[in-house]
Amino acid sequence: MLSLQNQRQPKTTPLTDDYVTSNTVLGYGINGKVVQCTHRRTQQNYALKVLLDSERARREVDLHWRVSGCRYIVNIIDVYENTFKDRKCLLVVMECMEGGELFQRIQDKADGAFTEREAAQIMHEICAAVDYLHSRDIAHRDLKPENLLYTTTQPNATLKLTDFGFAKETFTSYTLQTPCYTPYYVAPEVLGPEKYDKSCDIWSLGVVMYIIMCGFPPFYSNHGLAISPGMKNRIRTGQYDFPDPEWTNVSQAAKDLIKGMLNVDPSKRLRIQDVISNKWIAQYNAVPQTPLCTGRMLKEAEETWPEVQEEMTRSLATMRVDYDQMQIKALDKSNNPLLTKRRKKIEEMELYMANATRN
């Protein structure tokens, strides 16, 4: 079984000697649920992740523990190795991210209050976390909004990356070949038998940035399928666009950066050093304060977004492309369900207002 290579080793004393656990569920990771716990001496609240002991669980804890010193990665406070009902478990105590998920924070902003400059600052923080990982030859492999959490509800809160359930070292004799991914954020090379590496994280960064800028993903699935042949083809061929009116006022610099991250050829795709040194990221304070429609789009798609998140999660680590069954489909902008729903609402509202005016 994989040992925890970090110099620190799990404590074998009972977790309950130091912490009081609760039934309050804070979230669910790839390999286990997260509940709230409280330190007995300090009364400080923390997040507790419970993992059944396995090679995969130990790899997750090992990699996360190694990088938890980064300001933009959720910090591990303690790790315990305890036994419950004859089953060995790893109990991971982490800082409690009281500010919630990235997109919920954006959605809660007033219409027009979220700007391109704020988007650039968010991307700067996410890229700092990825840069820290990649410089240590670790690929996260599950970059998505649900894994980006704020420390507090305050305006100056820090955004941090969490959930290392799919993380993997990239300097070993093998390269990443296991298709662990979330459909909306999956890189083209992950969909096929080709080997892939840290460049798949850059692709995911591009998709996350796209959604941050407008409130909907560049690639989507048709007919409610977790990942359709058409969606796979759009990802493979890089078929997406920047539709109006949502992208009308977004800077060309932002669009160019997204294009660089979504290049279908991993050898030509930007590296994290290229992304983090890009002027739009590095000098985010100079980015124009153009109002974005992201918050409004997320609110108007509030009913749809949880379904999108579920769709993303359903196909994690389960998809392999069957090339013989691949069907080539042309991109049709109007088929994006998130955009279609929003525009239908706008048309209905305009019709209502027109009728009200006539009356």
Curated annotation (Swiss-Prot):
PROSITE patterns assigned: PROTEIN_KINASE_ATP, PROTEIN_KINASE_DOM, PROTEIN_KINASE_ST
Ranges for domain Protein kinase: 20-281
Binding residues annotated for ATP, in chain numbering: L26, G27, Y28, G29, I30, N31, G32, K33, V34, K49
SMART domains, per the entry: S_TKc
Pfam families: Pkinase
EC number(s) reported in the record: 2.7.11.1
Enzyme class: transferase
Catalytic residues (positions): D142
Record PTM: Phosphorylated and activated by MAP kinase.
Reactions listed under catalytic activity: L-seryl-[protein] + ATP = O-phospho-L-seryl-[protein] + ADP + H(+); L-threonyl-[protein] + ATP = O-phospho-L-threonyl-[protein] + ADP + H(+)
A GO molecular-function annotation: protein kinase activity
One CC-aspect GO term: cytoplasm
BP-aspect Gene Ontology terms: intracellular signal transduction; negative regulation of mitochondrial electron transport, NADH to ubiquinone; positive regulation of cell size; regulation of JNK cascade; response to salt stress
Gene3D superfamilies: MAP kinase activated protein kinase 2, Phosphorylase Kinase, domain 1, Transferase(Phosphotransferase) domain 1
InterPro entries: CDPK_Ser/Thr_kinases (IPR050205), Kinase-like_dom_sf (IPR011009), MAPKAPK_C (IPR027442), Prot_kinase_dom (IPR000719), Protein_kinase_ATP_BS (IPR017441), Ser/Thr_kinase_AS (IPR008271)
Keywords: ATP-binding, Kinase, Nucleotide-binding, Phosphoprotein, Serine/threonine-protein kinase, Transferase
Family: Belongs to the protein kinase superfamily. CAMK Ser/Thr protein kinase family.
Biological role: Its physiological substrate seems to be the small heat shock protein (HSP27/HSP25).
Name of the protein in its database record: MAP kinase-activated protein kinase 2
Protein source organism: Drosophila melanogaster (Fruit fly)
Gene: MAPk-Ak2
